[in-house]
């Protein structure tokens, strides 16, 4: 049994979505149940009380979040300047997942999608690191194939693989 916890605590606009009591309950009651927690930088700053701007600060934040009881931590670095590198910590070793910044405003739901893909692949029997690697590949493609809907942050394209299969003739339409 695995639990992937995406602590959705802060909106794209920077507004806190949880009151202090809920954050305390999340840290005390939910994080210790997590096989993996997947905070972004602003969420990790709330969980740790620290400012995160460097790779070293990302590592320290992972240590602090791991100390709250999560088995593993995947700290998503997309909110930092430069390349959107994510950091995985299993309690012993750190692994950076390097990425290239994709110029798009269509990033709504990226964190939820990544954690869901990781959870689904863990349920399929993949190891934690395999699930993270599959999740990273999936979310990168979903962002690359995103499309504009409405105003502001648009969604990623969750069904990009289906569209690619149709174009390649693997699925008859």
Labelled PLM ranges:
Residues 94-108:
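Short pre-catalytic strand/loop immediately N-terminal to key active-site residues, enriched for Gly-Thr
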Residues 46, 104-128:
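Short, small-residue alpha-helix embedded
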Residues 51-58, 123-133:
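Short, charged, surface-exposed loops that flank catalytic or proteolytic processing sites
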């Amino acid at each position: 049994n695995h639990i992937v916890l995406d602590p959705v605590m802060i909106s794209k606009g920077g507004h806190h979505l949880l009151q202090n009591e809920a954050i305390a309950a999340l840290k005390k009651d939910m994080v210790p149940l997590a096989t993996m927690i997947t905070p972004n930088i602003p969420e990790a700053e709330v969980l740790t009380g620290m400012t995160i701007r460097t790779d070293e600060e990302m590592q320290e934040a992972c240590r602090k979040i791991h100390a709250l009881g999560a088995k593993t931590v995947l700290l998503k670095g997309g909110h930092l300047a430069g390349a959107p590198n994510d950091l995985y910590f299993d309690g012993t070793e750190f692994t950076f997942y390097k990425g290239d910044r994709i110029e798009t405003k269509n990033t709504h739901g990226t964190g939820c999608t990544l954690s869901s893909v990781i959870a689904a692949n863990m349920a399929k029997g993949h190891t934690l690191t395999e699930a993270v690697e599959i999740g990273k590949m999936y979310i990168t493609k979903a962002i690359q194939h995103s499309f504009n809907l409405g105003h502001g942050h648009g969604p990623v394209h969750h069904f990009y693989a289906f569209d690619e299969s149709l174009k390649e003739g693997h699925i008859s339409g």
